[in-house]
Swiss-Prot record:
<dbReference type="GO" id="GO:0005737">
    <property type="term" value="C:cytoplasm"/>
</dbReference>
<dbReference type="InterPro" id="IPR005758">
    <property type="entry name" value="UDP-N-AcMur_Ala_ligase_MurC"/>
</dbReference>
<dbReference type="GO" id="GO:0009252">
    <property type="term" value="P:peptidoglycan biosynthetic process"/>
</dbReference>
<keyword id="KW-0067">ATP-binding</keyword>
<dbReference type="InterPro" id="IPR000713">
    <property type="entry name" value="Mur_ligase_N"/>
</dbReference>
<dbReference type="Pfam" id="PF08245">
    <property type="entry name" value="Mur_ligase_M"/>
</dbReference>
<feature type="binding site">
    <location>
        <begin position="114"/>
        <end position="120"/>
    </location>
    <ligand>
        <name>ATP</name>
    </ligand>
</feature>
<keyword id="KW-0132">Cell division</keyword>
<comment type="similarity">
    <text>Belongs to the MurCDEF family.</text>
</comment>
<protein>
    <recommendedName>
        <fullName>UDP-N-acetylmuramate--L-alanine ligase</fullName>
        <ecNumber>6.3.2.8</ecNumber>
    </recommendedName>
</protein>
<dbReference type="GO" id="GO:0005524">
    <property type="term" value="F:ATP binding"/>
</dbReference>
<dbReference type="InterPro" id="IPR013221">
    <property type="entry name" value="Mur_ligase_cen"/>
</dbReference>
<dbReference type="InterPro" id="IPR036565">
    <property type="entry name" value="Mur-like_cat_sf"/>
</dbReference>
<dbReference type="Pfam" id="PF01225">
    <property type="entry name" value="Mur_ligase"/>
</dbReference>
<comment type="function">
    <text>Cell wall formation.</text>
</comment>
<dbReference type="InterPro" id="IPR004101">
    <property type="entry name" value="Mur_ligase_C"/>
</dbReference>
<comment type="pathway">
    <text>Cell wall biogenesis; peptidoglycan biosynthesis.</text>
</comment>
């Protein structure tokens, strides 16, 4: 039995979240009656309202009066008045991942998992399948610039989704094709240990059907080890590793883009082919790897090489993934969502490879618990930045932790040899700090998952204002 077509209204608590908004949008396009509430009147809420979805700003019990079903995200607390009201009314309450899983039953599905790179890889898979005339439905964890949204309703048989591992619910997703980009220590507040995280990814791969396949990056040692523990499922490996089935070679990262070619070697004896002259208009080895994962899926699903090449060259990127926000005095300002040390290191390495100028990193650490658990990694992930400007920690609802803050990170950076790490006292001081350091050909990269994205977009104008 599939989700009844006449079920509704379906009420989303936290409808403005990036994951929730995508599911709500696709369900509305499928003909379901959808409504929802959010604490903030953000861009996602406004977009949904413009598309005819009933939205409420603020959480109140009366918002669920006519609901037949309630969908909640992991960010919603048990004392939320709408959730309390729904349970008093004995309404079915489902998690975001459960509703996503129901949608996935309508299509054949590609699920993209991994600690980093999920959103970009999901966008790339969608782009390549679209180029192959497969017209996929897409539910992503970020805004795909070509669509102007994080969700897209396609007429084809395939769906591409970002599989969020943060609370373990990605194990509920019925994927036919799985991608694992990497596995690093993250979300330890939920999993408790790195071993539990690795076990969850193993089960994620085991869940694919016998007729499906998994695409896994063996450049990452934890993923390569996981490959050795998977039995009875088809695995396609990718990476720069000479043993990869889909191998990234001859990569050139100059000029703010990635040029490379890919060699495909099937386990069938004698099969080998190359796809040459690939250009991705995004810098960074990590993005070339993301593109290789997407290429592996597209090739397996029959997308021609010429279509892959053309689609990669025209890829419009994802919002908040090395997004250019403006220029000042010959320097270019970027906004990036990177908030884990591995992500920060990859972004700054890409910036370093793309310019002959200086790299200035502005970081707003996200969550005290993350800074505490990965403190040593944070102290060493900024080596490719000539200057690091550190803002106060974005708490995301957490209580402060003694000895874990902006100043301790600055001290840690300096203790490990960084030559220029400075404190940002207030957002209003940022333009002055940058103006004293940035010049022609420099890259100014704003990093974090909090309010720093607003600073990144305001910074070009603020710098111009300093010059009068």
């Amino acid at each position: 039995m599939k989700l009844p077509e006449k079920l509704g209204p379906i009420h989303f608590i936290g409808i403005g979240g990036i994951g929730m908004s995508g599911i709500a949008e696709v369900m509305a396009n499928l003909g379901y009656t959808v409504q929802g509430s959010d604490a903030n009147d953000n861009a996602n809420v406004r977009r949904l309202a413009e598309n005819g979805i009933r939205t409420f700003v603020g959480h109140r019990a009366e918002n669920v009066e006519n609901a037949a079903l309630v969908v909640v995200s992991t960010a919603i607390r048990r004392d939320n008045p709408e959730l309390i009201e729904a349970r008093e009314r004995r309404l079915p309450v489902v998690r975001r991942a459960e509703m996503l899983a129901e949608l996935m039953r309508f299509k054949s599905c590609v699920a993209v998992a991994g600690t980093h790179g999920k959103t970009t890889t999901t966008s790339l898979v969608a782009t390549l399948l679209d180029a192959g005339n497969l017209d996929p439905t897409v539910i992503n964890g970020g805004i795909i610039n070509a669509y102007g949204t994080n969700a897209r309703m396609g007429a084809g048989d395939w769906m591409v989704v970002e599989a969020d591992e943060s609370d373990g619910t990605f194990l509920k997703l019925p994927a036919d094709v799985a991608i694992v980009t990497n596995i690093d220590p993250e979300h330890l507040d939920h999993f408790g240990s790195f071993e539990a995280i690795k076990d969850a990814f193993r089960r994620f791969i085991d869940n694919i059907p016998f007729y499906g396949f998994a695409v896994m990056c063996i450049d990452h040692p934890i993923v390569q080890d996981l490959v050795g523990h998977i039995e009875d499922r088809r695995i396609i490996t990718y990476g720069e590793n000479p043993q990869a089935d889909v191998r990234l070679i001859d990569i050139d990262l100059k000029g703010g883009q990635s040029r490379f070619r890919v060699m495909i070697r099937d386990r069938r004896p004698g099969f080998r082919m190359e796809i040459e002259d690939l250009v991705l208009p995004m810098p960074g080895r990590h993005n070339a790897l993301n593109a290789t994962a997407a290429l592996a899926v597209a090739h397996e699903l029959g997308v021609p090489s010429d279509a892959i090449r053309k689609a990669l060259a025209g890829f419009g990127g994802v919002k908040r993934r090395f997004t250019r926000t403006g220029e000042w005095n010959g320097a270019t300002i970027f906004d990036d969502y990177g908030h884990h040390p591995v992500e920060i290191q990859a972004v700054l390495r890409a910036a370093r490879a793309s310019t002959d100028g200086r790299v200035i990193a502005i970081v707003q650490p996200h969550r005290y618990t993350r800074l505490q658990s990965l403190f040593e990694d944070f102290c060493t992930c900024f080596n490719d930045a000539d200057t690091v400007i550190v803002a106060p920690v974005y708490a995301a609802g957490e209580a402060p932790i003694e000895g874990i803050d902006r100043d301790s990170l600055i001290a840690g950076l300096k203790a490990r040899g960084h030559r220029d790490a400075v404190a940002l006292e207030r957002p209003e001081d940022l333009a002055r700090l940058v103006a004293g350091r940035a010049g022609s050909n420099d890259y100014v990269v704003c990093l974090g998952a909090g309010t720093i994205t607003q600073w990144a977009y305001a910074l070009p104008g603020e710098l111009a204002a300093l010059q009068g």
